[in-house]
Amino acid sequence: FLGLGTEPYAYFKQASKTLTDRPWRLIHADLHRGNIMVDHHKKLWFIDWELGLYGDLLLCIAAHIHRTRYYERERKMLIEDIKQGLPEAFLKNFDKDLEFYLNFEAMKSVITDTYRFPEIFKEERFSAKKEAELCMYYSDNLNKIAPLIGCKTTTPDEALRWFQEWG
């Protein structure tokens, strides 16, 4: 229906061959506001490490940016702050590789949310605002990957109709 084809990750398999070889680290890979805690000493703690793995730190940064959904200005500031704090070995092709990982995160969300969102729309009642946020998130992700893999694009209103129909 969406035009993802039988090999939706084919683009990413090919494009991953151009990623820069940088030092790998233990990464969380699921950092978002719900997985970051501050204790009474104002010390940060990262919880829920079930997706932790050994890999490219840029994947972890992209996953955080994708899941946290910063405003564009905040996103740019965060990326610049991160770049300022990283050793030189992590900065080669930073922007290009980060964009790859952001697209990869969008693809993963589309695949997961195409199944998940109709189910949760059927089972739960959301405010109109929350429905709009979920549909905008979905359509933004689908529209982001469309030029890369040739799938459909959508609007938040159309996504809502799909979720209601599929649920």
Which sequence ranges carry the predicted segments?
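Active-site activation/catalytic loop segments of kinase-like enzymes and analogous catalytic loops
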Residues: L58-L91, N103-R125, D140-I145
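ATP/Mg2+ or Mg2+-diphosphate-binding catalytic cores
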Residues: T112-G167
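All-alpha amphipathic helical-bundle segments outside canonical DNA-binding/catalytic cores
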Residues: L91-E105, K129-E133
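Activation of the activation-loop gatekeeper triad in protein kinase-fold domains
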Residues: H41, D48-L53
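An alpha-helical support segment within catalytic cores of ATP-dependent transferases
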Residues: F1-H28
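Conserved catalytic-loop position in the HRD/HxD motif
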Residues: R25, D30, N35, D48
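A cross-family kinase active-site recognition segment
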Residues: F1-L2, R22, L53, A132-C135
